[in-house]
């Protein structure tokens, strides 16, 4: 149940969302513009979960509905369908095209520019 670094999936995350009807992606580290556009197009969200907390996260899974591409990608990278309750995650990319990752990057760049 522990999240994996998401940016590795960036090149094809939009296709995966379309093919499997995914409305939520759980990971850590954030995603980029292609995934943000796919979230907007498919009414989906990116959920940033806590790395290193697999046991806590696993306790929130109430049912495994299915798994796809397990042989191709292995367990950590497979596409898992879960039912969850009280899953501790932060929505950092939403279906309106908003990205907390982009917002924080812009604020950080502004703060650093003011120090120069």
Name every feature range the model reports, one short phrase each.
Residues 1-87:
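Feature captures the catalytic cores and cofactor-binding loops of soluble hydro-lyases/lyases
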Residues 13-14, 91-116:
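Active-site/ligand-binding-proximal alpha/beta "capping" segment
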